[in-house]
Structure formats: C-alpha cells, structure tokens
C-alpha cells in the first residue's frame, strides 16, 4: 500500500479523502417506498395467453390493427428465447405478473379531480410542484394508465401535441401513431420487445411541429404501485424539422417481496436539423426487473442527447441506441 502511495505521490490521508469523495451516498428511498393501499378498478389475471390479450384489447377498446398487432407480438414472444446476453432474469416468472392494472380513476387535467391517495403519491414525489415551477406539461401514470395529463396553453398554441398514447391512437393522430409505432423497436428485436408489443399500456405521445422551439421541458412520470405487476408504457416522440424539445421521464415503485417488472419502450424521431434531449431519472426498488428498450432515429443535421440516471432495481438493462444515416451509435 505504502509503495503504491509513494508511486502516486499521495499521502495516506489524501488517499482516504479521495476514496470518501468517490463513494456515492446511499439514496434515501423513503419517499419512493411508501405504498398506497391496493384499490384498483381492474386487475388482469396473471399469465400470457391469447385470451388475456383479447381481454386487454377489449378493455382498452383498441382499433382492429392494434388488436392484431398485440396477438402477433404475443406469438413472437412465445417463439423467442429468453436473452442469454444480459444479466440473469431467472427470478422473473411471467405466469405471476399481472400485465395490466387499471387505477380507480380515468385521466384528468386538473390535480384536484384525482383521488386523494393517488394525488398524495405524486405530491410526495414533487410532480405537481415541478409542473407549477418549471415544466411546459406533465403526464402522470399510475400502474397501467395515465391519471393526469396537461400542457400549458402557450405551448399548445404553438401546435405542440402532448397527450397520452391511447388518445393519440384512437383520435386525431391515429395515422401518425400507425406510421411510427414500434417501427424503431420491433417485436422481433428481443423477447421483451415482443412482450411490450403484446401488453403495452399508457405512455405519452409528443409531436413538435416544424421550427417550433419548446423552451421549457415536458415531463412524464410513471409510478408502479401494484404488487406483482408489470408496467409497459410506450413513449413516442416526433420532433419535426428545425424544432427542439427537452423531454424528462421519471419512474419509481415501492418495495415488495415479489417480483415487479418494468418493460417500457421509447421511440424518438428527430427530423432534419431538429434537436431532442431525452432525460431519464429512475429510482427502482430492489424487487424490480427493469428491462427498457429505447431507440432514436436522427435525420441529417439532427441532434439527440440521452441523459440517464437509473438507480436501484434487482436487474436493470437499459440500451439506448441512436440511428443516423443507417449507422447505429450506442449511447
């Protein structure tokens, strides 16, 4: 030890101080570990079968093409092996994961209309406060569905679309969703991409028109409260030519003694000379399997910035990739 210190020119006390500075303090998870009483409106039976996927499609009133997409994704999921190139996930048994849990409220655009216990959860996490101070819009998902979504009037007046995926899928932007949904991340990419294609629910849809600069961030927060459940939100963002956006994603869940699963999907389209910063802060409990897939397609002159802080989880696998002119750039 003394020889090594001498070679580096450090005294022993200096080495100790450097070691102390390099250690990251444990995160206080107390705010994240507070559980709400499980009081769901509907919980899908555990397991994955064509019958459960049909029930999910009916529950969500999917268009026909999405019903078919889900069933095709399930078939691919059943055909594909568990990936052997990452950490072991042998403790994850999909026969004991509820793939859809609907909260006891539909989506609101005013916090005062949300049930008090759910609102208290997001208050503890600081989401309404952040919206008031520094965000252009906020989406808040609780288990499998959005319970809150809102965007500032001045941002909407610029033509910026920020809504939940279900509204985009079945409303004015249905054609755009059909064009872009799971084209960057396809069900055949890997087993958990196929799982996502079969059971996805929730998430946010963003479209920024040509030349529009969104000066303050949008944020979506995904909270998984249900025990033994999965969360499979889909985020789809298109930033058109010459436009710019900063999008923030936050995730957390309380700790249970059984496995929970987060297998979200992010698809980002950055058009010519556009710019997108995508920031993620995840704070997972130690029973969480966090298996995310994120991709961006960046056209000529476009810029994508990935900023990610992913903490906790029993197993975590995050693989953001940017494609530019048919070349992949791992980030």
At which residue positions do the language-model features occur?
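Conserved beta-strand/loop scaffold segments within soluble protein domains that form the structured core
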Residues: 148-150, 154-327
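Intrinsically disordered, low-complexity regulatory regions of eukaryotic regulatory proteins
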Residues: 10-12, 18, 26, 325-328
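Short acidic (Asp/Glu) and glycine-rich catalytic loops that position anionic groups and cofactors
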Residues: 35, 50-54, 299
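Conserved oxyanion/phosphate-binding beta-strand-loop segments in alpha/beta enzyme cores
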Residues: 30-44
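N-terminal amphipathic, basic helical "cap/leader" segment at the start of enzyme domains
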Residues: 16-19, 23, 27, 42-189, ...
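Intrinsically disordered, compositionally biased charged tails
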Residues: 1-13
């Amino acid at each position: 030890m003394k020889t090594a210190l001498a070679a580096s020119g450090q005294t022993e006390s200096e080495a100790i101080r450097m070691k102390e500075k390099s250690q990251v303090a444990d995160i206080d998870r107390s705010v994240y570990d507070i559980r709400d009483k499980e009081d769901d409106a509907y919980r899908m039976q555990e397991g994955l079968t064509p019958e459960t996927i049909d029930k999910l499609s009916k529950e969500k009133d999917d268009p026909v093409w999405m019903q078919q997409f889900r069933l095709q994704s399930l078939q691919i999921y059943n055909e594909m092996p568990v990936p052997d190139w990452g950490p072991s996930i042998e403790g994850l048994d999909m026969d004991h994961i509820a793939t859809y849990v609907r909260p006891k409220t539909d989506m609101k655009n005013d916090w005062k209309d949300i049930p008090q216990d759910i609102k208290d959860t997001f208050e503890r996490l600081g989401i309404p406060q952040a919206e008031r101070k520094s965000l252009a819009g906020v989406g808040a998902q609780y288990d499998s569905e959005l319970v809150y979504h809102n965007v500032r009037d001045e941002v909407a007046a610029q033509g910026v679309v920020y809504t939940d995926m279900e509204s985009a899928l079945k409303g004015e932007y249905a054609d755009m969703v059909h064009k872009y949904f799971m084209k960057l991340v396809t069900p055949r990419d890997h087993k958990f991409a196929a799982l996502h294609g079969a059971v996805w629910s929730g998430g946010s849809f963003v479209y920024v028109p040509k030349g529009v600069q969104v000066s303050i961030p949008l944020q979506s927060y995904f909270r998984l409260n249900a025990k033994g459940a999965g969360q499979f939100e889909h985020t789809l963002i298109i930033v058109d030519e010459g436009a710019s956006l900063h999008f923030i994603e936050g995730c957390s869940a309380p700790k249970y003694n059984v496995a929970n699963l987060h297998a979200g999907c992010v698809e980002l389209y950055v058009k010519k000379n556009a710019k997108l910063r995508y920031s993620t802060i995840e704070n997972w409990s130690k029973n969480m399997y966090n298996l995310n897939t994120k991709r961006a397609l960046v056209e000529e002159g476009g810029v994508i910035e990935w900023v990610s802080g992913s903490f906790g989880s029993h197993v975590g696998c995050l693989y953001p990739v940017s494609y530019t002119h048919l070349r992949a750039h791992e980030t």
